C-alpha cells in the first residue's frame, strides 16, 4: 500500500483511477514530499489491551492512544486509508477531538476528548467520511505474547493534513523536536516517549518548550518506569504490557 512494484510502468499507472495516478507517479519517481511521507506512511506496532491489563494490574486504565498518526482531519472530510497485511488482527482509526466539561470548576471548559469516533479498517483500500474534527490514532490491540507483526498503513496525499508529532525513539533530539513543532499546524501536538505521551496545546508548547523537550519526556518516562518497577510489572509481565499514560492540557481545572 506504500510502494510500487519495480516493473510498474507509467502506462499501467495511467490506467489507475484518477485519485491514484498522482500518488503512484510520485512513489515511482521518488518525488513524494519527505515531510508528508514520514507521517502518511507508517508501520504501526501492536499494543496491549487496556481493559485486560487494568483488571490484571488492578489499576486505572492506561491509554489506548499509543499509535499517533500526526494527521488532522475536519468534519465531513472524505479520506482514503490504505492498509497492508493485518496478519488477521483487527485494526481501526480513532479520531480524537475535544469535549466540554465542568469537572473541578463552576463553568464549562474545553479539553481533549477521552475517546472519539472509531472507523474499522480492512486490508486494501478504505474510504471513510469523518464525522468530527480531530487527530487520527491507529487502534491495533493484540496479545503481545503472540508476537504480532507491525501493520503498514498509508493515509495518502489529500486525506487529512499532516501536522506531525515527536517520537522519542525515532526523532531522538531536541533539534528535531523544535523542527517538528515549528512545522505543526493543529491545535494540539503530540510527544511520544517510552512510557508517556504528551498531547498538549501547540501554542503553549511554542511559548514554554519551543526548543527543548527531552528533559521533560525523560523525567515522566522515568517516573512511570519507577512506578511500574515498584508494582513488579517488568518482572512479572515482561514484554506483555506496553501501553502509555496520556497527558493532556485542559483549558480549565487548574
Would you name each region that the model predicts?
Residues 61-64, 118-121, 172-174, 179-182, ...:
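Short amphipathic alpha-helical surface micro-motifs
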Residues 3-166:
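Beta-strand-enriched, solvent-exposed domains that form extended recognition/catalytic surfaces
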Residues 178-180, 187-254:
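Catalytic cores of extracellular degradative/oxidative enzymes
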Amino acid at each position: 500500500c506504500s510502494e510500487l512494484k519495480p516493473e510498474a510502468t507509467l502506462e499501467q499507472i495511467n490506467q489507475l483511477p484518477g485519485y491514484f495516478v498522482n500518488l503512484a507517479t510520485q512513489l515511482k519517481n521518488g518525488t513524494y514530499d519527505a515531510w508528508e511521507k514520514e507521517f502518511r506512511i507508517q508501520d504501526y506496532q501492536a499494543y496491549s489491551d487496556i481493559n485486560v491489563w487494568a483488571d490484571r494490574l488492578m489499576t486505572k486504565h492506561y491509554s489506548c492512544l499509543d499509535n499517533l498518526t500526526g494527521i488532522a482531519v475536519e468534519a465531513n472530510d472524505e479520506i482514503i486509508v490504505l492498509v497492508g497485511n493485518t496478519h488477521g488482527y483487527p485494526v481501526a482509526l480513532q479520531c480524537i477531538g475535544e469535549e466540554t466539561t465542568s469537572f473541578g470548576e463552576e463553568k464549562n471548559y474545553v479539553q481533549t476528548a477521552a475517546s472519539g469516533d472509531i472507523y474499522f479498517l480492512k486490508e486494501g483500500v478504505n474510504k471513510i467520511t469523518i464525522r468530527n474534527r480531530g487527530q487520527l490514532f491507529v487502534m491495533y490491540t493484540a496479545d503481545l505474547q503472540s508476537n504480532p507483526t507491525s501493520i503498514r498503513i498509508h493515509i495518502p496525499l489529500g486525506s487529512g493534513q499532516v501536522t506531525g508529532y515527536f517520537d522519542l525513539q525515532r526523532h531522538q533530539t531536541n533539534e528535531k523536536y523544535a523542527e517538528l513543532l515549528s512545522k505543526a499546524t493543529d491545535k494540539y501536538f503530540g510527544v511520544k516517549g517510552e512510557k508517556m505521551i504528551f498531547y498538549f496545546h501547540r501554542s503553549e508548547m511554542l511559548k514554554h518548550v519551543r526548543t527543548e523537550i527531552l528533559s521533560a519526556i525523560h523525567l515522566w518516562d522515568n517516573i512511570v518506569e519507577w512506578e511500574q518497577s515498584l508494582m513488579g510489572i517488568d518482572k512479572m509481565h515482561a514484554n506483555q504490557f506496553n501501553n502509555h499514560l496520556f497527558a493532556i492540557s485542559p483549558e480549565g481545572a487548574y
